[in-house]
Structures are given as C-alpha cells and as structure tokens.
Amino acid sequence: MKFSVLMSLYIKENPQFLRECFESLVAQTRQADEIVLVFDGVVTPDLEFVVTEFETKLPLKLVKLPQNRGLGKALNEGLLHCDYDWVFRMDTDDICVPDRFEKQVAFIEQHPESIIFGGQIAEFGKNVNDIVAYRNVPTSAQEIIKFTQKRCPFNHMTVAYQKSAVINCGGYEDLQEDYYLWIKLVAQGLYMANLPDILVYARVGNGMVSRRRGVNQAKAEWRLFKLKYRLGIQGLLSGLFTFALRFGSRLLPTSLLKKLYQTFLRK
C-alpha cells in the first residue's frame, strides 16, 4: 500500500527541530510514498534551507500558503494535495521511532476495515534520552469511545487515517482541531484503535502548554460540549461537568496548567 505523510510548517518553528524531524523520516524502515509539507504562511530563510536540504532525501511535496491560516486550515489544504487515501500525520518538531511507518502499514494490512488509528507518545525535553512523561491513550474502540467523553482519544502526531473519511465529515476545525475531528469520526461508529507501542517522541516546552490556554480555548470548550452532546458521545449532566472542568483549566495561568498536565494527565 501507498500512503502520504501530512505536515504543517510555520514561521516560528526551530530549524534544528525540523532537521531532527526530517532525519527521523529518512531513517524509517518503511519509507513514505510522499510527504506533503504545507507552509502555513511565509517561513524563515533558515527553515527554507532545511527543507531544500532534504528535498533530495525525502519525497517532499510543498504546498505554500501566502498567509498564516492556522493549523486546522493548513491541514485541510494539505489533505487536498495528498495523492493517497491513507494519510499519516506528523508534526515538524517531533521525532518518529524508526519503525513507526512499518508498524502502522502492517496494522492497516491486518485490519483493512480501519479508518483511523494512532499510538502512544513519549514526551521529551532536550533530546529523546530526556523523557519527561508519557501520554497513553486507550487501544480498543470501546475504550476510545469512553475516553472521548472527557479527553482527546488520539495522539495527533501518531495518527493514520483515511483521507476520504476525514473530508466527508468536514475536516479539521480552527481550534482544538484534532479533538473536534476525532469526535465526529467516533460518532460515526467507524473502526478505530490505538497501538500500544510508542510511535513518536513528542517535544515538550516550545510553547506547548501556553497554546492550550486562553479565552478562545475556553470558548472552544463550549462548542466541544455541544458537539459531544448532539452526536450522542456524552450525556447532558456528565457533559456539563466535563465542560466545567475543561473550561476552568483553560483559564489557569500557564504555570498551574503545566502542573495540572504533569500531575493528572501524564505518566
């Protein structure tokens, strides 16, 4: 089978992080058939240099947006340029384990009814030997449905999905773009899973926690609650309770939100 990798690059990315990401793609035991890299607006000359360096090493397909449109819209645009129905997501500052694609291709071949699946991540600081936490997500469809009521059930940078299914349900939203999408897919009763294996080393710091707080993120929680209730993912009282907890967390100072993540949401 053939598959596309979908990535989005923006001006504030660190060139060294991008280089390490690309190196992990070069080192894959099963190479991607194409890598669609969306430039979400103008990027720095240093980032352009790294991309040019790897154009001879990776099957890069560049999609350049004239203005920054945000991750959700950039990914929606990138999907339209993916030649293959199976799309593997990757972030430009993370690092794939060497056999990530090999494992995911094997899963698809063993489970052709699959629509979406991902895996586990190890979060790191300075380098992949500096593991600070793990974000574990459930592996079975039944556990994923239950998990979706309260938290995002997939690690976005590990996910592989069928492009047609994502486009048919409306694609990505602007805020909390992945969680909205997973809710819509889960509600359709499609075959889904997560591998128990760590597939990606995810970089922490780099503004990760601060991007998850703020008034707009808090407002997005109300839309999440309404979507989960409307699609039958979560009941009214349980949904309101979850909304209150998630809404409040979005308004915490960054230092407190970081402690919340470390204490309750990571292992």
Swiss-Prot record:
One Gene Ontology MF term: glycosyltransferase activity
Alphabetical keyword list: Glycosyltransferase, Transferase
Enzyme class: transferase
Glycosyltransferase among keywords: yes
The EC number(s) this enzyme carries: 2.4.-.-
Superkingdom of origin organism: Bacteria
Family: Belongs to the glycosyltransferase 2 family.
Protein's name according to its UniProt entry: Uncharacterized glycosyltransferase HI_1695
Taxonomic placement: Bacteria, Pseudomonadati, Pseudomonadota, Gammaproteobacteria, Pasteurellales
